[in-house]
């Protein structure tokens, strides 16, 4: 199997998001990379499922709360930007203050 660099990056992000999800389910508080990976992976999957950019921007702010992350992580993440694949092409999605 030959993957482009972009496809490899998407797979790595998906795997990191899955690892973060499992840690969250075990009751662990997520660190910065885990929080970003989980939110990004969730947004990419929701885009693939057909949600709009606006829906993703709203959904991205509901995935994690301050109680889900280590102290100070929420203050470190001001925005998350991903390029997501939608049924009509690739678009940039920005979620401001994703952890509330």
Curated annotation (Swiss-Prot):
Pathway: Nitrogen metabolism; urea degradation; CO(2) and NH(3) from urea (urease route): step 1/1. GO terms for biological process: urea catabolic process. Pfam families: Urease_gamma (PF00547). GO terms for molecular function: nickel cation binding; urease activity. Its EC number is 3.5.1.5. It is an enzyme of class 3 (hydrolase). It is found in: Cytoplasm. Keywords: Cytoplasm, Hydrolase. It comes from the Bacteria. InterPro entries: Urease_gamma, Urease_gamma/gamma-beta_su, Urease_gamma_sf, Urease_subunit. It catalyses: urea + 2 H2O + H(+) = hydrogencarbonate + 2 NH4(+). GO terms for cellular component: cytoplasm. PANTHER family: UREASE. Belongs to the urease gamma subunit family. Heterotrimer of UreA (gamma), UreB (beta) and UreC (alpha) subunits. Three heterotrimers associate to form the active enzyme. This is Urease subunit gamma. The gene is ureA.
